[in-house]
Amino acid sequence: REAVSPMRKSGFFPRLALVNLMRNGRFYGPYLLSCGMTAAMYYILSYLTFSDIVASVRGAGYLQSLMYLGRLVVTLFSAVLLLYANSFVMKRRRRELGLYNILGLEKRHTARLMVWETLYCAAAAIVGGLAAGVLLSKLVLLLLLQLSPLPVEYGFEISLSGMADTAALFGFLFLLTLVWNLFGLLRSRPVELLHSAS
């Protein structure tokens, strides 16, 4: 009976991607933490932008304009941060990626691995960022209401529009990093990767 290659087994690449992320935790830990923090900031600004309570505060138009400007600033900051941090992490994994080729993985296999790694990173950063944003958004709203004579409401509110906007933005940014990584993989040569600094 013909032996089945491990790479053809179901779940091989998802498991290997998870192992890689854990093994490179010293790089991916700060990377995911920074991504999650910016996702939380974006959600909080979106939450305040769409909040009916903020809309009823004196000077609401001015406040909402500030929130829109804040979302734009966080968007630009997040794009720069993700691309720079991703480049930093991938430079330190170049030798590892070159070794995969020596061990028999073709570039298409490494590309599949990168896809799974990006999916895991995106899920962790978006879910973690939204969770932190939801928890902190009420606190930020309470601080804002100190500037208003309106009574403080202690209920818990979640902005579905804010969650959707946050997930869409950071999903797109992680997609950009994946495309960039795949482009770099296609242009690279295994020998160059192996002689790169780890």
Q: Model-predicted segments: where are they?
A:
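Feature of multi-pass inner-membrane transport and sensor proteins
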Residues: 1-29, 92-96, 106, 141-162, ...
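Hydrophobic alpha-helical transmembrane segments of multi-pass inner-membrane transport and secretion
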Residues: 26-53, 62-98, 119-132
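Small-residue-rich transmembrane alpha-helices
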Residues: 39-50, 84-88, 120-150, 161-187
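Conserved transmembrane alpha-helices of multi-pass membrane proteins
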Residues: 59-76, 148-176
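Short alpha-helical segment immediately N-terminal to, or the first helix within
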Residues: 99-100, 113, 153
